[in-house]
């Protein structure tokens, strides 16, 4: 499949995704139909082709949490210079509006309109999904979730069909794929040992078909793994769902610290195979210690 650059114009005969409508205009409640040649085709890795109008193309910049976060990172939130605070993070929050009240729909629309870092797009499994641009810091998303909880409107994000997956930039993805089981099986087993009730309390949901626990035979790049390595520049945690402001913020901080640890871990890549595997296992054990700080 052809990968489009963000500056490539839609040409005559090119297939217009979403019937030629700017997806960012739609996020603000405006249906903006674009004729052939008027919009810009944007390629969002793992999401596919998307069209934006000229105004949003000029003002928007880099779109998508799957892209290399070093390009066009939106420095939202904290001004701290710690490694942890400056680790780019993105989320994709699924929504369920099939039985939503007018106030819930209005709240979601206001949420999207108030954001310069997320937009609404379609998802075949739910009624909508809000991916964010890479963020440094958690203040903005924290305030949004706190506001929704205060007004008893978190139900639009916590339906049992929804997820709230977390992506954190990782500079060791190829290595993580190679030693996936050594790194993540200890953490997987610890989460499994919590029991269903505690998992739902901590993560907002239990294992399910699109967030499955792993075993020694799991494919490291299987999309449904709770720890997903299929993206080139991020590690994704697929288990969470938003059920509360503090609950989800705790999950974000946990996964950010896990990936930050992996990014700066000395995997001894020049050592022999036995040493490399033992080093990867030691990393996996350290991730469990991180998890125990949070839950």
Task: Describe each PLM feature range.
Residues 112-119, 149-157, 188-191, 257-266:
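A common structural junction motif
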């Amino acid at each position: 499949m052809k990968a489009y650059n963000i500056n490539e114009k839609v040409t005559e005969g090119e297939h217009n995704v979403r019937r030629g409508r700017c997806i960012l205009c739609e996020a603000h409640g405006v249906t903006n139909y674009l004729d052939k040649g008027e919009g810009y085709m944007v390629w969002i890795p793992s999401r596919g082709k998307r069209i934006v109008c000229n105004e949003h193309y000029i003002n928007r910049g880099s779109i998508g949490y799957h892209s290399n976060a070093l390009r066009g990172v939106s420095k939202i939130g904290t001004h701290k210079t710690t490694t942890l605070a400056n680790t780019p993070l993105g989320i994709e929050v699924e929504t369920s509006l099939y039985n939503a009240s007018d106030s819930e729909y209005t709240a979601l629309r206001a949420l999207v309109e108030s954001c310069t870092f997320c937009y609404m797009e379609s998802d075949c499994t739910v009624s909508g999904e809000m991916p964010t641009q890479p963020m440094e810091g958690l203040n903005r998303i924290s305030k949004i979730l706190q506001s929704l909880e205060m007004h008893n409107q978190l139900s639009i994000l916590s339906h049992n069909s929804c997820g709230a997956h977390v992506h954190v930039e990782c500079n060791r993805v190829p290595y993580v794929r190679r030693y996936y089981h050594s790194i993540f099986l200890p953490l997987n087993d610890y989460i499994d040992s919590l029991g269903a009730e505690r998992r739902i309390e901590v993560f907002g949901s239990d294992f399910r078909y699109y967030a499955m626990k792993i075993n020694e035979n799991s494919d490291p790049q299987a999309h449904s793994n709770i720890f997903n390595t299929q993206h080139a520049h991020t590690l994704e945690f697929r288990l969470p769902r938003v059920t509360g402001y503090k609950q989800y913020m705790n999950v974000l901080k946990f996964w950010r610290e896990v990936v930050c640890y992996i990014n700066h871990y000395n995997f001894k890549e020049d050592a022999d195979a036995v040493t490399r595997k033992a080093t990867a296992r030691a990393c996996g054990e350290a991730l469990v210690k991180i998890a125990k700080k949070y839950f």
